Swiss-Prot record:
Organism: Capsicum annuum
Keyword Electron transport belongs to the record: yes
GO cellular component: chloroplast thylakoid membrane; photosystem II
Keyword Transmembrane: yes
The protein's role, per its UniProt record: This b-type cytochrome is tightly associated with the reaction center of photosystem II (PSII). PSII is a light-driven water:plastoquinone oxidoreductase that uses light energy to abstract electrons from H(2)O, generating O(2) and a proton gradient subsequently used for ATP formation. It consists of a core antenna complex that captures photons, and an electron transfer chain that converts photonic excitation into a charge separation.
Domain of life: Eukaryota
The protein's name in its UniProt record: Cytochrome b559 subunit beta
Keywords: Chloroplast, Electron transport, Heme, Iron, Membrane, Metal-binding, Photosynthesis, Photosystem II, Plastid, Thylakoid, Transmembrane, Transmembrane helix, Transport
Subunit description: Heterodimer of an alpha subunit and a beta subunit. PSII is composed of 1 copy each of membrane proteins PsbA, PsbB, PsbC, PsbD, PsbE, PsbF, PsbH, PsbI, PsbJ, PsbK, PsbL, PsbM, PsbT, PsbX, PsbY, PsbZ, Ycf12, at least 3 peripheral proteins of the oxygen-evolving complex and a large number of cofactors. It forms dimeric complexes.
Subcellular location: Plastid, Chloroplast thylakoid membrane
Gene Ontology biological process: photosynthesis
Coiled-coil intervals, chain numbering: none
Cofactor note (record): With its partner (PsbE) binds heme. PSII binds additional chlorophylls, carotenoids and specific lipids.
């Protein structure tokens, strides 16, 4: 699964 930071930095 992905982290919140990974999702927003995308």
């Amino acid at each position: 699964s992905i982290s919140a930071m990974q999702f927003i930095q995308r």
